[in-house]
Amino acid sequence: MLIIAGLGNPGAKYAGNRHNIGFMAVDAIHRRQSFSPWSKKFKAEIAEGELGGEKVLLIKPQTYMNLSGEAVGEAMRFYKLQPADLVAIYDELDLSPGKARLKTGGGHGGHNGIRSLDAHCGKEYRRLRLGIGHPGIKEMVQNHVLGDFAKADSDWLEPLLETLADNAEMLVRNEDSQLMNKIALALGGKAEEEKPRKEGKDGEKKPAGQSHIRQARSSNQPKLPATGPMAEMLKKMFGNKGE
């Protein structure tokens, strides 16, 4: 069994906040996949279903962000689960909007919801961080995270949530890097396994598999002199071959 916990604050007042992107993520999974209606248990809203043949519990703690671990920890104890059976989805200031990172364990990074999960659930669970960007000034952080997403943010927010929901089975199968690649590609980035394209002197990008020999002869190279002493010397050295 796997618990997928989205972190956020309950109530309509906070529904559109950047801090609630974890709630938005599990809501998207709930809409796209086959889950029971939301119900209340463990100081949370929960929904049961299956992904990839494995039982999955979606959970949205209703304790407010700073006490999220109370709800998730209670659910884990009820089902006798270990930290490895938990995926937490939450907002990350230090990632650009639309970026995602998934890893096991680590620190809380100043995120009080994760601090609470660490205290109640252990630390070796998987953490899916969804970037919301940093306002650039420490004093603006609270207003930033508790502010609503702008209308323009839908350009990256919708494909991010849709791609996560469409590929939620990858969380069950521990296909973490593949999921990150799916999200990156959906947001116009490149898959991590994809080799970067080489760039020539003229700034033209070429596929990684293309020969370097042709690229070494840039079209912007200066023309060789056709007349004069230098031209005569070059003809003697290389013959009268065209380029």
From Swiss-Prot:
Q: What class of enzyme is it?
A: hydrolase
Binding locations of tRNA: 14, 64, 66, 112
Q: Which InterPro entries match?
A: Pept_tRNA_hydro, Pept_tRNA_hydro_CS, Pept_tRNA_hydro_sf
Q: Where is this region: Disordered?
A: 190-243
Record site feature (Stabilizes the basic form of H active site to accept a proton), residues: 91
Record keyword Lyase present: no
Record-level GO BP terms = protein quality control for misfolded or incompletely synthesized proteins; rescue of stalled ribosome
Query: Which SUPFAM superfamilies does its entry note?
Result: Peptidyl-tRNA hydrolase-like
Q: Which residues carry the site feature described as Discriminates between blocked and unblocked aminoacyl-tRNA?
A: 9
Family matches, as Pfam families: Pept_tRNA_hydro
Its keywords, alphabetically, are: Cytoplasm, Hydrolase, RNA-binding, tRNA-binding
UniProt similarity note: Belongs to the PTH family.
- Which HAMAP family does the record associate with it? Pept_tRNA_hydro_bact (MF_00083)
Functional description taken from the UniProt entry: Hydrolyzes ribosome-free peptidyl-tRNAs (with 1 or more amino acids incorporated), which drop off the ribosome during protein synthesis, or as a result of ribosome stalling.
For this entry, the protein name equals Peptidyl-tRNA hydrolase
Record the organism: Rhizobium etli (strain CIAT 652)
The gene for this chain is pth
